Amino acid sequence: MQIKEALLPTRSTSTVAAFFDRLGCVITRDGSSVTVRIGLSRMRFVERDFDGSHHLAFTIPTGTFDKAHQWLEQRTTLLSVGDRTEFEGPGSWNSRSIYFDGPDGQVLELIERRALPIRHVESFAADDLECVSEIGVAVPDVLAAVTTLRAAGIRPYGNKPTSDFAAVGDVDGLLILVTPGRAWFPTDSRRVADTPVTVITSVERGLMLGAGKSLRPATASPAERAPNG
């Protein structure tokens, strides 16, 4: 399940643009929105007020973890538990991650998925980010959303879904379904933002996961792709 585009709100498009520009990402402004390119994916942010924080993860090439870690810590603040800034994923994920402080309170993540092919790079740069790997989506009923996605052929990934957390998709792209107000790991204070989110992906038909929370096919028209709410 490749995430082609994610449409979500931010309190400040200028803050988002400045942050990702500092990382070296390609930024495009279009009226009241800003679009950030992450490899094969795009993130489009539109200004609106809301409470809480978003979570996004970006896939890095397998074999580049140490170089990516060094590159990242020179550009932003890493999030930690104690003095630990590197985290192994669940055994079923075969991954490891670095979390970092994003703009507008975002909890961002670089993730190396060992099931993907190894790719060597001389020195890590923003161009080596492969895609948006995960996007957090607050839903009123996690298990009901899992059922909706399963019926469309998008299955749970890794650990068994619970009433407040489920990863759904595959190694190429995941929706992280969570209940509003839950803390984003590895913090205990940044709470899940309950906002409209639209994810453009390889689904064949549009799906609603809650008020303003939707999955849209890449073939949808611009009007159909627009965030709800």
Predicted regions: what is each one?
Residues 1-3, 9-29, 37-82, 101-229:
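Glyoxalase I/VOC metalloenzyme domain signal
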Residues 85-88:
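Surface-exposed loop and turn segments in beta-propeller and other repeat-based domains
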Residues 92-95:
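Short, small/polar residue-rich loop motifs at catalytic or cofactor-binding pockets
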